[in-house]
């Protein structure tokens, strides 16, 4: 009942709104708060809230609001933990990207070293070609030397003409051997040609590898773009989640503002209540002044009130006992608070343990995810390795297939045409797939133009070769004419021998060159393996290739200049050789003419004899010479073609590598741009997180400030409460003194009336003593039952004790026994007085004057106690009416109903009790007391006064006890407790029971007296 009235008095509390708002958020923890109501109350007490004032308000709303604040703090902590986890994930991704970039740098350095080694190998090849050219020059010089030697030997042949014929047959056999050697040389030349073809195949294989790498790069680009798209989608999702979090935080901020508004309203209400208390204090001051005036009037009467002081001492002892019981209760409350604090600490520890367990689970989940990712990465790496191995197998198969192809110019042209077709097809496919790769088409067009330029250059080189061949044919013709003129010479046999020696030396040189070529082939195989091993790390060298691109272009230009210079030098050497050859031919012609003149002059006769044999021999020699010259020319042409082919292949490889480097540069630039964009995004997210942190810290600081303000208000309220308590104690003490004085005044007034009635009572006392002896046992039982009823009323409440007494007491009780019982119930005489009365009754003698005085004193004491109780209840009713005026205005209908119910209840109980004293007992009483009929009016004066007092007290209790729940065990202390109720606000159900027992007793006395 009290809580409903208080909730109506405070309709401003945000109980429903706060709880309804809290249920909106999905992550709210209002219903899952680990704190109980006891812990909440303890925290409120520590924060400075008054329990009495809080109980007058809506407890549930305040607890829900506190739980809401705590849940919001928990949500903030949870969100902060999630943000930290996201930060750690982003940092790990950044470190992975950084590690991949470092690996790309390392691979780029390795590719750079491989490229430098390839350039060195190309230089070595050029040097070997230069050596071959020098060897050809040496052969030409050796041939010239042989011609000079032939001239010298021609003179010797003049002397040994006869011996030459026999040696000619031997020379024929030697020529046959030389033919076999020449065939062996041809085979060696074919082997060299096969090696050249093999190098060409290797070059084609490298081209195919480059194409496969381009395909891999395109695939990687596609995969990288897909990954970028997935990452962008993830970032969009994360931004959406962040926006949702911002909205939730804004809603929470609005809720905090609403809560602040409600707190301000409550503060205004507290201020109004404080003003009301100030007005009450003013009223108390006025009452103090009136009480002081009355005290001055009653100071003269203190000497005659020693008996009242003794009673006050007893009451003080009872009060001290009550205070001791209250202290015990306070100690029990302190123990309970300590238990609650221990429970709260245990709950906090449990919550912390649960949070730690949750964090550990999250850490384990994150570690498991990282392990899964690492495993997936390892699986991808293994799959890539397997793919590379499969590609190597495919490359080897392709190499075997390419080895079966022909390496003629027609096949190369067809291959170039096919490559052009493939490139065009690839370009169309790439245009269909990606419209952004227009640059690749331009590169392909450039490649086609470069190939056409190379074709034109090859054509020019073919024309130059044809011109050189024509010039060489002219030279050959001249040499043939010179050799034909020298056919007549016998010294040609010696020339053949020298030629054989030189050919042997050339064969040895060729064998050595072949061994060198084999060694170079092995070395190239090793380098190929290294190159293939390092080719896998090309992606890492992208950034270094950017820096070295300019250096490579410079080297390329220097290398091109170097090649041009070497070509110019070769041309100059050719021209010099041509000039030397012309000079030598002219000198040979001159010497031949001189020699011929001499021979004609000296050996005209000898030549005529051996012309036939010489002609046959010279024909064979000429054939052999022609064959040897043809072989030499073929070898030269093959060497030149192989050198040209190597240069072409090297230039093609160089161009392809340059294009690949450019593509890798572009890819690396794109990746760097993407990484920069991601870094910028991460920086923006970090700034947002920092701003969120600052905002949360500001909110937390505002909350702390509000808590500090509440603490200050708590201290102020505590000081006010202590002041009010001190004033209350003073007022209570003064009221008690005034009540005592009033009781004494009333007792003195009643003493005169009691003395007048004693004479009448002494006459009836003798007759009543006999009846008292019969009722002693019943009175004892009634006293015991009254004690039990008071205890049961203090514990269980309501009217159980009175019902027992009504059921146990017989209907044949006398009116005097009922009067005594009512006086015992109302005034509660001590057991000592009852024992004295029983003693006097047992003696059965006539009461003396001493007995009369004692009985008069007892009556006076009972009368004064009844008056004091009535005055205290009246004062309590006045105070209660003053305090509950606002409540009565808000709830008039409820109070009326309650009063009507209570009065009806009490009237019903009084009727039931009056039925017990039915009219059947009246004649018996009249029959037993015939002599006292005339004295009954005088004896009923006191009873009528007590009835009036009890009626007044009953009305005050009925009007006041409807809205209060606090009282004590005895009716004498009920008034004091009711006075304390207005300031303390304690509610106790046992007070209703005790007040009801008093009302029942008073109603019973009224019925009996009537």
From Swiss-Prot:
Keyword DNA-binding (UniProt): no
BP-aspect Gene Ontology terms: DNA damage response; nucleus organization; regulation of nucleus size
Tissue localization of expression: Expressed at low levels in roots, leaves, flowers and flower stalks.
Motif Nuclear localization signal 1 positions after renumbering to this chain: 445-452
Keyword Repeat: yes
Superkingdom of the organism of origin: Eukaryota
Motif (Nuclear localization signal 2) on chain: 679-686
Amino acid composition bias (Polar residues), ranges on this chain: 883-893, 912-921
Region listing for Disordered, in residue ranges: 787-813, 839-937, 966-994
Compositional bias of kind Basic and acidic residues: 849-863
Keywords attached to this entry: Coiled coil, Cytoplasm, Membrane, Nucleus, Repeat
Membrane topology per record: Peripheral membrane protein
Ranges in a coiled coil: 82-350, 404-763
Cellular compartment(s): Nucleus membrane; Nucleus, Nucleoplasm; Nucleus lamina; Cytoplasm
Gene null: resulting phenotype: Reduced nuclear size associated with reduced chromocenter number and altered nuclear morphology. Plants lacking both CRWN1 and CRWN4 or both CRWN2 and CRWN4 exhibit slightly smaller rosettes. Plants lacking CRWN1, CRWN2 and CRWN4 or CRWN1, CRWN3 and CRWN4 are extremely stunted and set few seed.
GO CC annotation terms, alphabetical: chromocenter; cytoplasm; nuclear lamina; nuclear membrane; nuclear periphery; nucleoplasm
PANTHER family for the chain: PROTEIN CROWDED NUCLEI 4 (PTHR31908:SF2)
Subunit description: Core component of the LINC complex which is composed of inner nuclear membrane SUN domain-containing proteins coupled to outer nuclear membrane WIP proteins, the nucleoskeletal CRWN/LINC proteins, and, possibly, KAKU4. Binds to KAKU4.
Role, per record: Component of SUN-protein-containing multivariate complexes also called LINC complexes which link the nucleoskeleton and cytoskeleton by providing versatile outer nuclear membrane attachment sites for cytoskeletal filaments. Required for nucleus structure organization (e.g. size and shape). Involved in the maintenance of interphase chromocenter integrity and organization.
Family membership noted in the UniProt record: Belongs to the CRWN family.
Protein name, entry field: Protein CROWDED NUCLEI 4
Species for this entry: Arabidopsis thaliana
Organism taxonomic ancestry: Eukaryota, Viridiplantae, Streptophyta, Embryophyta, Tracheophyta
